[in-house]
């Protein structure tokens, strides 16, 4: 029969598989165009990775287009179904040359991340945005949902609490852990 590619990779020395699951909500996955990724496919991949490697490194984002309290609940439920305790949650962040970047420019979110007021971003605003980027999980910069930034932060902490996640991130090569510097209740204005 056909050999499991994860088993072959593990035999060859691979010790970690990382998945950008992003969300457990089919609606959010559709809105962020995850190119055929479904919750069901991710459940299979996570379960199989955990079986072969003992651990699956999955990243999740909160604050994507269409994000609601219900979609965050769906993400928590996905983690619970597959027995996954994620290391933490990131806030959806726009990076240059990505679909999120173009959407953030269109919605005025780059200027809002710098000045607190949505609007067009000139070169100075974009430079300030780049200088303030930091880590994806330390504050809300480009909230694409209709929820206030404070609610996105609250939902993130609620999900972390429900799953027993520690916002501790494991180095992919050394296995060392490092606690993230997320401040409860922080928003982009607090950076």
What is each stretch, according to the model?
Residues 173-191:
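C-terminal non-catalytic accessory extensions
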Residues 1-178:
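A structural motif corresponding to the C-terminal lobe/cap of the Radical SAM core domain
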């Amino acid at each position: 029969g056909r050999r499991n590619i994860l088993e072959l990779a593990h035999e060859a020395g691979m010790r970690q598989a990382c998945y950008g699951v992003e969300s457990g909500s089919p609606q959010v996955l559709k809105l962020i165009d995850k190119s055929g990724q479904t919750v069901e496919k991710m459940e299979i991949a996570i379960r199989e990775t955990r079986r072969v490697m003992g651990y699956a490194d999955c990243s999740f984002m909160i604050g994507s287009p269409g994000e609601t309290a219900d979609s965050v609940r769906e993400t928590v439920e996905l983690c619970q179904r597959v027995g996954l305790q994620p290391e933490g949650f990131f806030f959806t962040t726009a990076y240059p040359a990505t679909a999120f970047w173009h959407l953030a420019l269109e919605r005025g979110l780059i200027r809002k991340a710098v000045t607190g007021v949505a609007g067009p971003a000139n070169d100075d605003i974009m430079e300030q945005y780049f200088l303030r980027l930091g880590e994806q999980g330390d504050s809300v910069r480009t909230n694409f949902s209709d929820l206030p930034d404070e609610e996105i932060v609250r939902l993130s902490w609620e999900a972390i609490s429900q799953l027993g996640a520690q916002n501790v991130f494991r180095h992919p090569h050394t296995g060392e852990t490092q606690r993230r510097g997320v401040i409860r209740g922080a928003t982009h204005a607090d950076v």
